[in-house]
C-alpha cells in the first residue's frame, strides 16, 4: 500500500516514509492511496481469532511490500498484549470497550502499534527518531511505557507545569532512559503552540528526525482500524441483520478508522455520532461537513500537535458525496439528553458511561429509526475507562466507578525538579543539551 496526501494526490510514499516524516510538505495529512478487498479474510475470522492476529494480518495487507508477513505478525504481537472487548448487553446492543490497556485509554492501542512499527523501520534503516508531543497525561504515560528499552526511539514530551504523569525515574533521558520531559510555564494550549512552532522549523525536524505520536501520524491512526474487524469477528455469529457503530467524535480518528475498515470491505451499514462544530445535520437529516465550504488549498496547514482527522474524513467521500448521506448519521444531542443516556445505560445495563460515551449513546437513540428498519444491531464504542471521567459520572448518577489500581499506578503524578520553559527556542536548546 502506498500513501498520498489529502492535499495532493500526486504524492506517493511508502509506509516507512509516511510514519517517519509524518506531515506532508503540502500541509495535508497522509492517507492510504487505495484499499485491498479483504472481505473473504474478514469473513474467515471468528471469536477465536485474537486481536493481535487480526492486527498482524491487516498490517501485512497494508504494508506487504515493505515487511514480510512474519515481521508484521511480530509487530502486532509485541504491540498488543492487551485487547479490546466486545460485550453483548441486550438483544441488539453491544459495547466495544477500548479501555483495557495499562492507562485505561484507547490511545494506547495506536501508540503501542506506532512505536513497534517505528522501531522495526529504524532497525532496518540503522537510524533513530524522536517523538515530539504535548501531553497532560495518557499520551505521555502510554508513550513512555511503550518506548521503554527501545534502542532507536526517544521522546520529547511537553507538559503544563505540574501535569507530568506516568513517568518513572528510569524513563528520564538524564538517567539513561528514552524520555525528555519538559514542563512549560503555561497551559496545554501553550504546549501545543510550541510543538507547532518547532514542527514549522524544517531544519530542526530533519536534525532530530522528529515525528508525532498522535493521530496526525498515519501509523497511529491505522491501528484504530483493527477495532472494527475485531468487533465483527465476535458479532458475525450473534447477529443476522445490519450492523451500526455509534461513537464519540473526538478528533474524528475512530470515525475515520471505522470508515477505513469499511473501505477494506468490512461488513458495516453505518456510523452514528453526535454533531460537532464541523459535522452537522441538514434540514433533511443528512450529514453535512461544514469545513467543505472552504477549499483545502485555502485552509491552513494540518496541525501536527492537536490534529483533526476531518480532512481525512472528507477525502473518503470526495468522489461520492451521496455515500456520506447514507453512511454517516449525526444527531444533535443536548446536555439533558446526554445525561439521560448516561442514566439509561446505568439503570438498564449497570454500565458506567463517561460523557463522550453517553453522547454517542444519546445520538444512537435519536437515530433509532435507521436501525429499526432491518432489525439492526448497534455497537456502542467506549473509548476510555469511565473512572477517568468520574466527576461527570458522579454528578450525573450520584455514584461513580472506582479507579482500577493498574490505571492509578500508570498515571501517577511525577516530579522532575527541572526549570520550566516558556518558548520553542528554550525547548530546542534543552534538546540540544540533553541529546
Describe the predicted segments one by one.
Residues 1-435:
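PLP-dependent amino-acid enzyme catalytic core
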Amino acid at each position: 500500500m502506498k500513501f498520498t496526501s489529502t492535499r495532493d494526490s500526486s504524492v506517493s510514499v511508502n509506509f516507512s516514509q509516511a510514519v517517519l516524516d509524518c506531515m506532508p510538505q503540502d500541509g495535508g495529512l497522509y492517507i492510504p492511496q487505495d484499499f485491498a478487498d479483504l472481505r473473504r479474510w474478514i469473513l474467515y475470522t471468528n471469536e477465536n481469532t485474537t486481536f493481535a492476529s487480526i492486527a498482524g494480518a491487516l498490517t501485512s495487507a497494508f504494508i506487504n511490500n515493505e515487511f514480510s508477513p512474519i515481521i508484521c505478525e511480530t509487530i502486532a504481537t509485541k504491540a498488543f498484549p492487551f485487547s479490546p472487548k466486545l460485550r453483548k448487553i441486550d438483544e441488539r446492543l453491544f459495547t466495544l470497550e477500548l479501555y483495557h490497556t495499562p492507562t485505561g485509554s484507547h490511545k494506547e492501542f495506536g501508540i503501542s502499534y506506532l512505536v513497534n512499527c517505528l522501531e522495526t523501520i529504524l532497525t532496518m534503516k540503522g537510524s533513530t527518531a524522536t517523538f515530539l508531543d504535548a501531553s497532560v497525561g495518557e499520551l505521555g504515560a502510554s508513550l513512555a511505557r511503550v518506548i521503554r528499552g527501545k534502542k532507536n526511539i526517544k521522546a520529547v514530551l511537553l507538559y503544563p507545569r505540574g501535569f507530568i504523569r506516568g513517568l518513572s525515574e528510569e524513563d528520564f533521558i538524564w538517567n539513561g532512559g528514552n524520555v525528555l520531559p519538559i514542563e512549560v510555564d503555561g497551559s496545554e494550549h501553550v504546549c501545543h503552540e510550541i510543538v507547532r512552532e518547532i514542527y514549522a522549523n524544517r531544519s530542526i525536524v530533519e536534525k532530530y528526525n522528529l515525528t508525532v505520536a498522535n493521530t496526525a501520524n498515519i501509523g497511529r491512526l491505522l491501528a484504530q482500524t483493527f477495532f472494527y474487524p475485531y468487533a465483527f469477528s465476535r458479532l458475525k455469529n450473534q447477529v443476522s441483520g445490519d450492523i451500526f457503530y455509534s461513537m464519540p467524535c473526538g478528533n474524528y480518528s475512530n470515525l475515520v478508522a471505522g470508515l477505513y475498515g469499511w473501505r477494506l470491505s468490512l461488513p458495516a451499514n453505518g456510523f452514528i455520532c453526535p454533531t460537532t462544530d464541523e459535522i452537522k445535520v441538514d434540514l433533511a437529516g443528512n450529514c453535512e461537513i461544514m469545513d467543505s465550504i472552504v477549499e483545502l488549498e485555502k485552509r491552513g496547514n494540518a496541525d501536527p500537535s492537536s490534529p483533526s482527522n476531518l480532512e481525512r474524513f472528507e477525502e473518503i467521500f470526495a468522489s461520492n458525496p451521496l455515500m456520506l448521506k447514507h453512511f454517516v448519521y449525526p444527531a444533535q444531542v443536548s446536555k439533558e439528553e446526554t445525561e439521560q443516556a448516561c442514566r439509561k445505560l446505568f439503570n438498564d445495563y449497570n454500565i458506567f458511561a463517561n460523557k463522550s460515551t453517553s453522547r454517542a449513546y444519546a445520538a444512537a437513540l435519536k437515530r433509532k429509526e435507521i436501525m429499526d428498519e432491518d432489525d439492526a444491531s448497534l455497537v456502542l464504542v467506549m473509548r476510555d475507562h469511565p473512572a477517568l471521567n468520574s466527576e461527570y459520572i458522579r454528578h450525573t448518577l450520584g455514584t461513580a466507578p472506582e479507579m482500577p489500581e493498574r490505571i492509578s499506578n500508570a498515571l501517577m503524578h511525577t516530579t522532575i525538579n527541572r526549570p520550566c520553559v516558556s518558548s520553542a527556542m528554550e525547548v530546542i536548546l534543552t534538546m540540544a543539551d540533553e541529546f
